[in-house]
């Protein structure tokens, strides 16, 4: 379980995630890096779900990005098609948020590709807490950047969700 949150504000997109990995009801590691840059540092991804499955999906998405020269939507749709048709991929239990400087998407565990209506996406066990916090911060008048809103949302989610911690990695594009 985890918390991954993505926020768009003032032409910037930031994705952040906590670092906790659990096995059943035990914390196995607190410094997992679930948010990573790829494709010439122009795309950022964040993963939730089974760690092994998330790594498989990350690698597949990175191959699609290379094949489609960094085109985010095309790469995500092609990955979703493969996810739905490839028998071995259908059992993967992971989802991811992918973003570049102008767009961000949720690629769900069932192979759906969702472009958000709002400027926030969140996944994982703490995702709803982080999304609510980020939306509240976006709707109030403040000078917080996308990266700062992600940091605050992750702190709040980490305080509430027992499967998320306060060891955060945040990337901005």
Swiss-Prot record:
Its EC number is 3.4.25.2. One of its GO terms (molecular function) is threonine-type endopeptidase activity. Na(+) binds at residues 158, 161, 164. Pfam families: Proteasome. It is found in: Cytoplasm. Allosterically activated by HslU binding. It is an enzyme of class 3 (hydrolase). Signal peptide: none annotated. One of its GO terms (biological process) is proteolysis involved in protein catabolic process. InterPro entries: ATP-dep_Prtase_HsIV_su (IPR022281), Ntn_hydrolases_N (IPR029055), Proteasome_sua/b (IPR001353), Proteasome_suB-type (IPR023333). Keywords: Allosteric enzyme, Cytoplasm, Hydrolase, Metal-binding, Protease, Sodium, Threonine protease. GO terms for cellular component: HslUV protease complex; proteasome core complex. It comes from the Bacteria. It catalyses: ATP-dependent cleavage of peptide bonds with broad specificity. The active site is at residue 2. Belongs to the peptidase T1B family. HslV subfamily. Protease subunit of a proteasome-like degradation complex believed to be a general protein degrading machinery. A double ring-shaped homohexamer of HslV is capped on each side by a ring-shaped HslU homohexamer. The assembly of the HslU/HslV complex is dependent on binding of ATP. This is ATP-dependent protease subunit HslV. It comes from Actinobacillus pleuropneumoniae serotype 5b (strain L20).
